Every structure is written in C-alpha cells, then in structure tokens.
C-alpha cells in the first residue's frame, strides 16, 4: 500500500445532532477517513489529530442559552477549512463576532429551496433549478428554530431563502463555511456534492478510503500486531464476526480458531448454515458448541427481558471462557466491535444517552482472560463492514440480511423461553421471510420478523376446536433505526402468510400484525 489511508482526514465535532453519524458516513462514502469527537475535546487532541478540515455538526441546544456548547477556539486558528452545519454554523457565527437570535416559532423545518448568491467553492457548478435572475436554486432540508441575525466580519452570504437571510455563509479567504440546512441527509438533493466540494476541493483530501484499501490496511496491521501467535474468535454468523473471521483468515490463515456457540436461539437451520459456509466452504477452523440445553435451563422460569439478556450474555461468556482455556496457544481475542460501539462506549464523547436495552456483546468478558484484543472493525460503520465483506467474498444474502438481536429468539419469545416456543417461532419466522422474498419486498423493508406471544387463543380446524399460541408479524421501514414506521404490506400478503403459518404449524392458532411505530414502541418487542 503506497499511502497511509488515515493520513488525510476530517474531524467532525458533535453537538448532539441525530444526524452526526450520518455526516461521518457521507464523508467515508466520498472516500476520506474521518473521526467523530465531542465538541468539548481538548485543543491538544485536535493538534495531535492534525485534520485537513473540521466539520461542526448540528445539535439540539440553543446558542442563545447560557452554558450551551461552543467549539474549541483552536478550531478557528488551526489554519484548516471549517464547515458549520446548522448549530455548527450558529456557534461559529457567534464565536467569530456575529449574532444569533432565538426562534420565536418561525423556524424552518423540512423542505426548503435556497437561492445561491455569488460564487462560492462550496456550491460550485451545483444547481437543482435556476431562478429567473439566473441564480442557482437548491432543494435542501432545514431543521432549525434559532437563526443567525448578523454574520461575522469577513463573511458573505452565499445563499438565502424567503425567510432565512443567512441560509449559507462563507469566508472564502479563511475557508470557513456555514450552512443552516443539513447536506448529509438525502432530502438535500445535492448534499453529497457539497460535502465532496468541501472535503476534496477545499480541504484538498484524496480519496484513499476504499474497501480494498481498508482491507489491505487491516490485514497489514493485524499481521504486525499478532505476529506468529494464535487468535480465538467468537463466530456468531452475524455480519461483524463473519467479516472479522474473513479478515483474520487473510492475515494469519490457520492460526485462527473460531468458536461457534449454538444457543438454541438462532433462526431456522442457522447453525448448520454457519458451519457449512465457514467450515466447509471457507475452510475455517471452527469449534462447534451445541449449548441449547444449557441456555434454556439457565433461563427456565425467567420472564423479565433484561434478566433474560443478562443470562444469555453470562452463559455465552462462560462457554467461551471454557473453550478458550482449552486453546493453550491462543494469545489474542478477536471481536467484531464497530465504530458506533466505540462512540457509544466512550460514554460517549457524544453525550449522555439512557440505556434502553443492555447489549450482551459489549464488555462482559472475564477480567482474568489474559489475552490481547484484536478489533479490526473498530473504525468502521456497519455499511462499510458490509462492503468489505462483499470484497472478501461473503455472500450478499448473508451480509444484507435484516438485523437479528444478539440474544436471538430469547427476546422474540415474550416471557419465559422454552424449546417448544422457539421451535414454533423459528418455523413461523421462516415462512414470513420466505414470502417477503417471493413478493420481492424483503430488501425494500428494513426489518421483518415474527414474535411469539405467551397467550393462547381459540381457533377452529375442520370441525375441531383448538386452543393454541398466538404470534405477531413485525415489519418496519427506517433509515437509521432510531425512528421507524410500520410497513404497509399488502393485505393479501399478510393474509397469505397468516394462512400458511396457521395451516403448516401445529401449535399456532392466530396471527396478528403489529402496527406500532417507533416511537412510541421499540422495533423489537423486548
């Protein structure tokens, strides 16, 4: 590899916006490395990072409120380009001598059209339409109450709307730019081109961050880190651990041992599929532990969702610890930690979020496990992990499957988990997913699954009355899984799935469809 793929980089300072990670993903998609830090980072950390440019992201606070977040002063003296987005533009304006006024119910939320004024590097050769006066018009997405009322000295207006005098501003000499809208969201039609102008033309970055270069870099770093030692990996068959396995195989070959723990809470035939793909097809060395009885025994009588998650996590760690001790030469433990995990566990450098559900795979490994940690995905977002998985030869169908919770069916069987319930649920879920594929809807929705409800309902089969279990179909559409709407599937499809489940699975008498959005509901039931 000729160039260091981390050498040219952008720093994004987060002020709490729900879109901040989206900015980082857009910059990565352009082909440039970036990191996401909290707004209150130390000046020395920025100096050490030495970014080619800095982006000040949005946030829910008001610049006019006492004690609201501010960018470190060094941002404006570092001599690198700066782009302020929404709150980022407002705090930049205020900190450099402009002023911001509190919105009095007249903010802009949703679609807006801005008119470009004059020539700016940020909007160069970009337009969605042309005004009668010849100026470019751009379709953008606004989300602000406060607004800049006076811009700092040296700045000019480069775009406005009918109600927002300073929709975008620039100090071209210092290469400081501010936009009141969100270029990172898809509703801003030319947003990707604006970010590309900033990162490549204004900051001067090259596109070194590609799937092939990421793989090459990860393999080289793991070879240097691991040397001739052996590595152990908990392989679940999910996206992250699967991609880690393929990267490690490329880096160290048969010095990798995978431990696959079948907890009895997987999807239909999933355990066999994992062994067939990674053991037989890719030739990985896998220890297959069938622990269904052990997991179900430990969960017997437990109906609290959080307690179930903790039991599943604890038993997995116990089994993994037992197996790792048998591998006397293993000096390293590999994990599928990805960048959003790093951001969250930093507590995060990006604010304080309430723990809604515990994640069984974050932390929790024994303190006495004397192994080094190998985390080749810790810089990557999920979409990047999937792309390098494709490059490594993993099948599209596996990489782009809908999300499956770490505790598996343990949180899709409501209440106490029993083998009978899991077996019924597995078959019902397989029918639902099969029919979505047949209808060419599987990849058009974001997540679909079946939930087992611990209630019986009266049904009629032929001339006989039956009293059997109820399941719920759940199908949602979302961009970021932070919010979601229930999928408006065709009634005929829902009816067909229901008929198949009731007729083909002895033990289920009723099928319902969940029409709850997020919020107020969560996507998973537990």
UniProtKB/Swiss-Prot annotation:
Q: Which InterPro entries match?
A: Class_I_gatase-like, GATASE, GMP_synth_C, GMP_synth_GATase, GMP_synthase, GMPS_ATP_PPase_dom, NAD/GMP_synthase, Rossmann-like_a/b/a_fold
At which positions is ATP bound?
236-242
Please list the GO terms describing molecular function. Answer: ATP binding; GMP synthase activity
Q: Per the UniProt record, which EC number(s) apply here?
A: 6.3.5.2
Catalytic activity entry: XMP + L-glutamine + ATP + H2O = GMP + L-glutamate + AMP + diphosphate + 2 H(+)
The record's top EC class is: ligase
Span of domain GMPS ATP-PPase: 209-401
- The entry's active site is 86, 182, 184
For this protein, the record's Pfam families field holds: GATase, GMP_synt_C, NAD_synthase
Keyword annotations for this protein, in alphabetical order, are: ATP-binding, Glutamine amidotransferase, GMP biosynthesis, Ligase, Nucleotide-binding, Purine biosynthesis
Name a GO CC annotation attached to this entry: cytosol
Keyword presence, rRNA-binding: no
Among CDD domains, the record links this protein to: GATase1_GMP_Synthase (cd01742), GMP_synthase_C (cd01997)
Keyword presence, Transcription: no
**What are the Glutamine amidotransferase type-1 domain coordinates in residue numbering?**
9-208
- PROSITE patterns reported in the protein's UniProt record: GATASE_TYPE_1 (PS51273), GMPS_ATP_PPASE (PS51553)
Copy the pathway line from the protein's UniProt record: Purine metabolism; GMP biosynthesis; GMP from XMP (L-Gln route): step 1/1
Please explain the role this protein plays, according to its UniProt record: Catalyzes the synthesis of GMP from XMP.
Q: Which HAMAP family match?
A: GMP_synthase (MF_00344)
Q: How does it assemble?
A: Homodimer.
The protein, known as: GMP synthase [glutamine-hydrolyzing]
Q: What gene does the UniProt entry assign to this protein?
A: guaA
